[in-house]
């Protein structure tokens, strides 16, 4: 092993014997009281020197060679150390290098830090609905390294669908599904496979019928939409494990007996021109993509048993908790 301090973390010296690794308080580490030998060792933890070489560096600097072992142990325990032999060399043509570096900072297990994007590459995600929200979600997921991103949308692109990072004006009149398939990379080894997760980003209605079918088939799914001046991401439904959209409706009906009639009319009579602020749509799309990626990367997103909601004009998100409803039955077998 040739130890390497994580190259994505800043290294700043607070004084000659104190070094801070990382600027974000969630994972920053401060080492203090370092002597000349330890300082020399730290400056040489660069993925080139192995442990015997680091011990020799400590000795030449007038320190105890065992200081190298202690320093490596501390850094490894803090989760800021990589094995330089297993880190891919920096490639300026690697478009996913910033994403790989970011995710590796969130992952504790050293094995996962070595190739953090592997789970994304294996995944297949389908986005249903390719308006202002769904089109951006699809492109973000593809750009973040998801192996296969497919789009299902039977409509044609209109000027109102155009948004930065999604569909463009040159797509006007082209089927939305076709316009996006032209810009989404296709993984040959994943053609025809069922999706690991489906994102429901309806351009009209509430997508409840799709959600029911996906729940029945055991397919994880996430809802992302704008309702007038509010954006809602969630729930992320893990069939048999977390609350579903019907659970949410039952909780609402407990408080508002007319809620089922409201939902039925919202599904059956979508507005001709739905309000969808472009900045709100972008925020919803980004949040939805983040939660999909978090799920694929092995985290538990806040949209499991919950929704993340944001509203104009300020876009400050808040989480609402939605536990499984006892009358729903979607988790009874769990």
Whereabouts are the PLM-identified features?
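Adenine nucleotide-associated cytosolic modules
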Residues: 1-334
């Amino acid at each position: 092993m040739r130890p390497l301090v994580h190259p994505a973390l800043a290294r700043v010296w607070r004084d000659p014997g104190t070094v801070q690794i990382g600027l974000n308080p969630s994972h920053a580490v401060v080492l203090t009281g370092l002597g000349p030998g330890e300082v020399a060792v730290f400056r040489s933890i660069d993925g080139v020197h192995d442990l015997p070489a680091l011990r020799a560096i400590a000795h030449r600097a007038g320190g105890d060679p065992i200081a190298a072992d202690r320093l490596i142990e501390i850094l490894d325990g803090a989760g800021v150390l990589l094995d330089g032999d297993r880190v891919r060399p920096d490639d300026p043509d690697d478009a996913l290098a910033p994403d790989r570096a970011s995710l590796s900072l969130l992952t504790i297990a050293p094995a996962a830090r070595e190739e953090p994007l592997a789970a994304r590459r294996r995944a297949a995600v389908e986005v249903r609905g390719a308006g202002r929200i769904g089109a951006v979600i699809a492109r973000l997921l593809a750009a973040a390294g998801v192996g296969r991103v497919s789009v299902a949308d039977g409509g044609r692109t209109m000027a109102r669908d155009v948004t930065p990072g999604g569909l463009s004006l040159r797509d006007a009149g082209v089927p939305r599904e076709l316009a996006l398939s032209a810009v989404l990379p296709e993984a040959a080894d994943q053609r025809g496979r069922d999706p690991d997760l489906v994102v429901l980003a309806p351009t009209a209605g509430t997508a409840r019928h799709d959600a029911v079918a996906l729940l029945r088939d055991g397919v994880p799914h996430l809802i992302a939409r704008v309702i007038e001046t509010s954006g809602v991401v969630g729930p992320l439904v893990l069939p048999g494990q977390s609350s579903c959209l019907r659970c949410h409706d039952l909780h609402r009906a407990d408080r508002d007996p007319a809620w089922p009639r409201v939902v039925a009319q919202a599904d059956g009579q979508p507005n001709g021109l739905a309000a969808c602020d472009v900045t709100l749509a972008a925020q919803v799309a980004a949040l939805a993509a983040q939660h999909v990626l978090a799920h694929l990367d092995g985290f538990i997103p806040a949209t499991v048993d919950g929704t993340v909601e944001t509203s104009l004009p300020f876009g400050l998100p808040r989480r609402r908790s939605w536990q499984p409803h006892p009358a729903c039955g979607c988790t009874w077998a769990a």
